[in-house]
């Protein structure tokens, strides 16, 4: 964490699961200050009390700013003196965005542009924008707006060399706020069947710690305009559900309710076109931005016509985890171990 020594980090949407994971991982380092920017004063107050209780010696490093990425003035107010930004603020619930697509546009697209414009004006050194696998071949409003968020970031990156701007794409972050596992655990506790959409549906899976690792990797190794992804494994929804049931109550019934608005049978982290230019970096892929300008005439003679033919990287052709492998992964997640310790079978 030497790159963060004495630095000020701003996290938009900072009271969410990602922000909590960053605070847990960064507060005990030599970072100077972490600013939490979000709309919900109650969540900020809860977070303040939580970290004062569990990390009293370093909790003063956290500074809270109430605001909305839709309001550029509130964004600028939080950004004075900031070195780095992790931009996590978003509307991310797929069905909700289907019913309120313009709200998703205002937060995910226009809000991102506000953050980037203010960051460039304030001389911020690096901005990492958190995106999603739903931005690749998007079929729903949330994915479409996150795809546009990436385009906004890449367009901004083309026009600045003082602020490095990168995007990271995630699959499903296990046990994050609003995700399915906390719902299933509550259903099991209540003695009800757990509800799944479609058993054969596949999803990439990663932990919150892996989500933070991806952002830090992008921060350290990404270049301006890059999209970075982790080579994440995947599993079927049925496999994930069986793993949760076996951990908490193997007698729990699994009830299929059908696909919700805007959902896909599988997700894609890199498209065919992106795979053709992707750089293999071990556990990660880096997709460099297309740095060409709009004057295509000069590329008729000078352009590179050779492209490697590759298939997309999606949740059907990555490693598919078994029930036992998913259980092992779940048992590394504090949310699960805490829930199990409080569980009375």
Predicted regions and their residues:
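Hydrophobic/aromatic anchor residues within beta-strands of the central parallel beta-sheet
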Residues: 64, 104, 165-168
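Conserved Rossmann-fold NAD(P)-dependent oxidoreductase catalytic core, especially the SDR/UDP-sugar
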Residues: 87, 91-151, 156
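Conserved residues in the N-terminal Rossmann fold of short-chain dehydrogenase/reductase
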Residues: 38, 65-66, 106, 198, ...
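Strand-loop microenvironment adjacent to phosphate/nucleotide-handling motifs in alpha/beta enzyme folds
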Residues: 151, 155-172, 177-345
């Amino acid at each position: 964490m030497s790159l963060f020594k004495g630095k000020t980090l701003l996290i938009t949407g900072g009271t969410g699961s990602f922000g909590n994971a960053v605070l847990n991982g960064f507060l005990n380092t030599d970072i100077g200050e972490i600013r939490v920017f979000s709309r919900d004063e109650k969540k900020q107050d809860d977070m303040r009390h939580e970290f004062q209780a569990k990390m009293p010696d370093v909790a003063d490093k956290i500074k809270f700013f109430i605001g909305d990425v839709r309001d550029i003035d509130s964004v600028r107010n939080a950004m004075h003196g900031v070195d780095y930004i992790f931009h996590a603020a978003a509307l991310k619930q797929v069905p909700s965005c289907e019913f309120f697509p313009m709200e998703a546009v205002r937060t995910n697209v226009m809000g991102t542009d506000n953050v980037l414009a203010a960051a460039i004006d304030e001389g911020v050194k690096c901005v990492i924008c958190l995106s999603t696998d739903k931005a690749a071949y998007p079929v729903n409003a949330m994915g479409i707006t996150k795809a546009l968020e990436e385009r906004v970031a890449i367009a901004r990156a083309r026009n600045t060399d003082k602020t490095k701007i990168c995007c990271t794409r995630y699959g499903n972050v296990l046990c994050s706020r609003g995700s399915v596992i906390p719902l299933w655990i509550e259903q099991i506790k209540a003695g009800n069947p757990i509800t799944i959409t479609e058993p054969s549906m596949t999803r990439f899976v990663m932990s919150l710690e892996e989500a933070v690792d991806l952002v830090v990797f992008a921060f350290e190794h990404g270049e301006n305009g890059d999209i970075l992804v982790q080579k994440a494994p995947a599993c079927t929804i049925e496999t994930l559900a069986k793993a949760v049931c076996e951990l908490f109550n193997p007698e729990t019934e699994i009830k299929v309710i059908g696909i919700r608005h805007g959902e896909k049978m599988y997700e894609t982290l890199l498209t065919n076109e992106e795979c053709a230019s992707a750089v293999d970096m071990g556990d990660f892929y880096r997709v460099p931005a297309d740095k060409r300008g709009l004057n295509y005439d000069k590329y008729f003679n000078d352009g590179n016509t050779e492209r490697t033919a590759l298939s997309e990287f999606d949740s059907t052709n990555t490693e598919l985890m078994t029930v036992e492998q998913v259980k092992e992964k779940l048992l590394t997640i504090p949310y699960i171990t805490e829930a199990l310790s409080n569980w009375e079978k």
